[in-house]
């Protein structure tokens, strides 16, 4: 069974809607750069490994740099589109997905021992009191169907 585990450093980005100019859809530079970061990280780790040909299960976990609201489906869309043709032939093969977002704690330790205060810009990122750096965790596995 083919299985890929990937960690992409940096703040996860949502896939932006393409802008239409003269009847043509144009993907913005920020989205292209973010997709390229996912693609490049996959190629760096797995080289020219053959993409999965069968059904795919994917698990995505987005460790966010802020509590700014982002739709989970647009976060997932960027990652799954970036892996088309490298991890799997096409994202239509994805038949099972689990997506989660990890947001930084609203409250952080205060200056006095045992106290808490509201998180401010520039505070370390904490989840349940544990520090982290923004990144995306991706787990992809082929679903083996014994009847095929």
Predicted regions: what is each one?
Residues 1-148:
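Acidic, proline/glycine-enriched N-terminal capping motif
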């Amino acid at each position: 069974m083919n299985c890929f585990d990937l960690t992409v450093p940096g703040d996860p980005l949502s896939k932006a809607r393409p802008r239409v100019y003269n009847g043509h859809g144009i993907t913005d530079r920020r989205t292209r750069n973010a997709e390229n970061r996912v693609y490049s990280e996959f190629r760096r780790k797995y080289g020219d490994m053959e993409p999965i040909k069968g059904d795919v299960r994917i698990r995505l976990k987005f460790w966010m740099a802020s509590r700014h609201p982002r739709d989970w489906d647009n976060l997932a869309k960027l990652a799954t589109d970036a892996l088309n043709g490298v991890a799997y032939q096409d994202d239509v093969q994805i038949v099972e997905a689990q997506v989660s977002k990890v947001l930084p704690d609203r409250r952080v330790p205060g200056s006095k021992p045992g106290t808490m205060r509201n998180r401010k810009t520039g505070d370390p990122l904490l989840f349940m009191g544990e520090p982290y750096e923004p990144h995306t965790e991706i787990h992809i596995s082929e679903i083996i169907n014994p009847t095929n």
